[in-house]
Amino acid sequence: MTMDPHRRLRKAFFDAPTLPLSRHARYVLFSDCHRGRGNSNDNFLKNQHLYSAALQYYHRHGYTYIELGDGDELWENRSMGQIMDIHRDTFDLLARFYREKRLYLLYGNHDIIKMSSAKARQSFTPLFPRITFHSGLILKDMEHKKDIYLTHGHQTDLFNSTLWPVNRFLVRYLWGPLERRGFLDPTSAAKNNKKKRRTEEKLTEWAKENGCILITGHTHRPMIGTADAPYCNTGSCVHPYGITCIEIHHRCLTLVKWMVETKPDQILYVSREKLADTICIDDLKTYL
């Protein structure tokens, strides 16, 4: 029997690992990097230097890196090994976090094979021995007020969760080739605004019904929660002009964009910019 979206989301957090959320903890949440094979379909390629600069910043400042799924594009590409070869510098940076026990990777719909594929896991083994990929993760509030639930967010859609093999086939053999000719995939929440809004509404509703703060990726639309809507989205690393993420520090959330800017003397530099006011966890309502 097909589960409804709310049950699929609850299942994502069954036996999910927990991390402490204290005033001293620092987490940075990225999602939807879609690292590819370095070809014309590799949407991550144009932002790889921004991503590298951001990772170096967060490593230097003591953040724990959490990736909320779709880190690698494994619908359009079959080989995780090829992706790691092309983006070796990126994975070397991630491995630094892993060696210091500061890296956690979730899977989304586009890299869902990490859930069970021994071959995909094997590609990670040299740099990330005994790595585990999770469907969800919970930041447990040490002040016993409001926990933060992290997952990819594809669970609201039947074709991106239960029927993902069908959707992967369509992306690989239909929408992928058409995208190279300028057509957008109408089944994608990242490219279809109507589907994007429906997904966001379902995720917000789930967060309210379950009395938690929910942070996902999937739609590629960055957003920070409000007092009445305890749902946030990290955005993605495939925007044309930058990458976005959410920083968590002092039990507060900050939506950040990394981009290339120009100084008056025409020197290019990487900038880190807040996209919205920082909001603290105690400012977000929960409904239970």
Regions found by a protein language model. Name each.
Residues 148-201:
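Active-site-proximal loop/helix segment associated with metal-binding centers of metalloenzymes
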Residues 32, 70, 108, 152, ...:
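Active-site glycine-centered loops adjacent to acidic/histidine catalytic or metal-binding residues
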Residues 18-26, 30, 35-141:
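Core catalytic region of metal-dependent phosphoesterases/phosphodiesterases
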Residues 186-201, 205-213, 264-288:
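A short C-terminal boundary segment appended to hydrolase-like catalytic domains
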Residues 194-252:
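Extended, basic/helix-rich recognition subdomains
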Residues 1-26:
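Acidic, histidine-bearing metal-coordination/catalytic regions of metal-dependent phosphoesterases
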Residues 26-34, 147-154, 231-235:
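Active-site-proximal beta-strand elements of phosphoester/diester hydrolases
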Residues 229-288:
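Binuclear metal-dependent phosphoesterase catalytic core
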